[in-house]
Amino acid sequence: MNIKFSPPDITQAEIDEVVDALRSGWITTGPKTKEFERQIAAYCHTPKAVCLNSATAGLELVLRILGVQKGDEVITSAYTYTASASVIEHVGAKIVLCDTGEDGYEMDYDKMASLINEKTKVIIPVDIAGKICDYDKIYRIVEKKKSLFKPSNDLQEKFGRVILLADAAHSFGAVRHGKMSGEWADFTSFSFHAVKNLTTAEGGAVVFKNIDGVDPDELYREFMLWSLHGQSKDALSKMKIGAWEYDIKMCGQKCNMTDIMASIGLAQLKRYDKMLARRREIINRYDEAFQGLIIPVEHYGDDFASSGHLYLARIKGIDSETDRNAVIDKMAGCGIATNVHYKPLPMHTAYKSLGFDIKDYPVSYAKYANEISLPLHTLLTDEEVDYIIECFIKAVGEVTKNERPD
């Protein structure tokens, strides 16, 4: 067999939607993008959604709209992909990395609390593998620390505390205590990249909660300005007969979503619940088969359900990169693509150059050293899942010299 790690699930429905966009004569930001925004907002139970070309763009635009700048600090996880932190550098603020907690892949919340000071403006929690972070705990911490918060503009003043921006690149469709991903943090950024549960090839979206004293329509327009060069009209409005006149309000960015991208998303969203259900089936089969072999992510419980984006397995009996990589090699020999999520940021050249040292993040390193991500996607057949299970158990047994490590 040849099993890919995370191929996009594209059906005739997606193809038909894209063809419809191509034939419409309007292929950049237009009616399909606006409809996709409406459907995302409805799905997430939020007043607005802003479609962009990536989750990274979403994170950065939120920081810019909040006025985060040089002299400010933003806290995020050391155990994440670079996008969670690089956007902080982009706006000129200081990156503050927090080690992982012993349980799961979220930040160590006690350490996170200790990192908050008068310069802290935003915290970016990361929903690793599709599981929503413990926002009850996070909100308690920022409320307790609100006396330290020093707003530098009117929008920050509206919050009166450190602002929460969810890196929810993995968690679109996840639920916690009856609330959707997108309903928890003040702002939430989703990814629709090709490897994500719901894809638009490239793409992302920002949603936000109602903020006291802030008109959601005005906030939406602020995102529109930032996403299209600060232009007062989008392309669709500007192209109406006789309506060419526009203004550049500020020097914005260029990160809008196109109707071709939105077309894929509209088709995916129609069948997304079934896609989530299939992911849950595969996760349940993995969990049952690997009892005693790994430390898994707890994706489902009485009052929460992740989006089932990644199957992260920490292998018992392995505590080194060398042995973990040996398992990866054996899986490759079986024709199975695997991955590692994540190499902690302090191990990368860019973050070393900023002064970070992995020795200061021992829990993140320990989780990384024995973690392997198995294929988890909606194109997997039951036969392929059985084969992955068989090969993984065998590979781990050969490396650990123990078929079922305790």
Please report, for each region that a protein language model flagged, where it lies by residue.
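PLP-dependent aminotransferase-like
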Residues: R64-A168, V175
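Hydrophobic/aromatic ligand-binding patch that stacks against planar heteroaromatic rings
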Residues: S86-I88, M180, I260
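Active-site PLP attachment segment
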Residues: H170, E183-K233, D259
